[in-house]
Regions:
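Conserved beta-strand scaffold positions in the cores of enzyme catalytic domains, especially
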Residues: 29-31, 95-99, 123-125
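ATP-dependent NMP and nucleoside kinases share a basic, alpha-helical "lid"
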Residues: 40, 44-45, 62-72, 76-119
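ATP-binding Walker
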Residues: 11
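Conserved substrate/cofactor phosphate-moiety recognition/catalytic segment
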Residues: 14-63, 67
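Hydrophobic anchor at the beta1->P-loop junction of P-loop NTPases
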Residues: 5
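Small-molecule kinase domains that catalyze NTP-dependent phosphoryl transfer to phosphate-bearing small molecules
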Residues: 100-146
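P-loop (Walker A) phosphate-binding loop of NTP-binding proteins
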Residues: 8
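Walker A (P-loop) ATP-phosphate-binding motif of ABC ATPase nucleotide-binding domains
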Residues: 2
C-alpha cells in the first residue's frame, strides 16, 4: 500500500509519516520525504517544472518499492492535482491520498505554495489543528476515514 500525504509545508506530513513508522512499529515501511528526494537528486528548483519533477521522482520510487512488496508512506507537498490524480489512477486501490492541513502557520510560511491544488475527490482528510499525532494516526488507519 502507498499512503501519499499531501499538503502545504508545515502542515504535519513529515511528522505524521515519521510517527507512523516509529511509534506504530511499521518497520517494514519505507518513508519517502520531499526534502529527501530533493537532496538525493540535487533538485533545488522550486518552479512548477521543478516541483513536478520532484513529485515524479517520488512517484517512481514509490511505485518501485511497492512492486517489491514494500509499504510506502510519502510526505510531499505535491501541489498539482492533475499529477496526483494520474498517479492514483495508475496505482488503483494500492494508493491512498491523504490531505494533511492546518490553519496554523508553523514557521514555514516562506515555503507556502501559492498554486497548491487541494484534493477534491477520493482522498482522506486530516486536519492537524489541535489534535495529537497519535489521534491523527488513529484517524488515518480508521476504516471509516474517507
Amino acid at each position: 500500500m502507498i499512503y501519499w500525504l499531501t499538503g502545504q509545508p508545515g502542515s504535519g506530513k513529515t511528522t505524521l509519516a515519521k510517527a507512523i513508522i516509529k511509534e506504530r512499529f511499521f518497520r517494514d515501511w519505507f518513508h519517502i520525504d520531499g526534502d529527501d528526494i530533493r537532496e538525493l537528486f540535487d533538485n533545488k528548483d522550486y518552479s512548477k517544472e521543478g516541483r513536478m519533477k520532484n513529485v515524479l521522482l517520488a512517484q517512481q520510487l514509490a511505485q518501485y518499492l511497492h512492486s517489491k512488496d514494500k509499504d510506502v508512506i510519502v510526505s510531499l507537498v505535491s501541489p498539482y492535482k492533475e499529477q496526483r490524480e494520474a498517479f492514483k489512477e495508475k496505482m488503483g486501490d494500492m494508493i491512498k491520498e491523504v490531505y494533511v492541513h492546518t490553519s496554523e502557520v508553523r514557521g514555514r510560511e516562506n515555503f507556502f505554495v501559492e498554486d497548491y491544488e487541494q484534493p477534491t475527490e477520493n482522498y482522506a482528510d486530516i486536519c492537524t489543528d489541535n489534535i495529537l499525532v497519535d489521534e491523527c494516526i488513529n484517524k488515518l488507519f480508521s476504516p471509516s476515514l474517507k
